[in-house]
Amino acid sequence: MSSTPVLAPVPGRALPLSEVPDPVFSQGMVGYGAAVDPPRQVVDAIAPVSGKILKLLPHAYVIMTAEGLGVLVHLGLDTVGLDGAGFTTHVAQGDAVTAGQPVITYDVPAIVAAGLSPVVPVVVMDERDPANITVGTAVGSGSDIDVGATLFTANKQ
């Protein structure tokens, strides 16, 4: 079994996915993982794993690891409707990235001003078994997590 640490892409309060106010994430429809409620300031969202940028949108990105793990970072909820406002990308789709590398600058105050939730779900795409995700202690306690700290570990058979 391989284990991949998945880093917090932004600082803030670590949350279990069940507390994300969107059933697509809270019910594990796209996969399992955890989330971060960021501070109300502009932050750089980093790559939570090393790999290739498989998909890059202004408000979300998917990184595929060498082991075939697809990790989605979604900056805020319902932010697709902002057409990129509040987000500045620093990489291109297809780029190789290293865990900890800045991917998108996220203007959290702009998202809040638009009346949207700034919560950042981080999920292993297509993971159907929550037992394969081991959340970090910050997630279980709802405490603050630093950017780049381990948010959860993805275990793959």
Which residue ranges define each predicted feature?
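Contiguous, well-folded functional domains in the mature portion of proteins
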Residues: 1-157
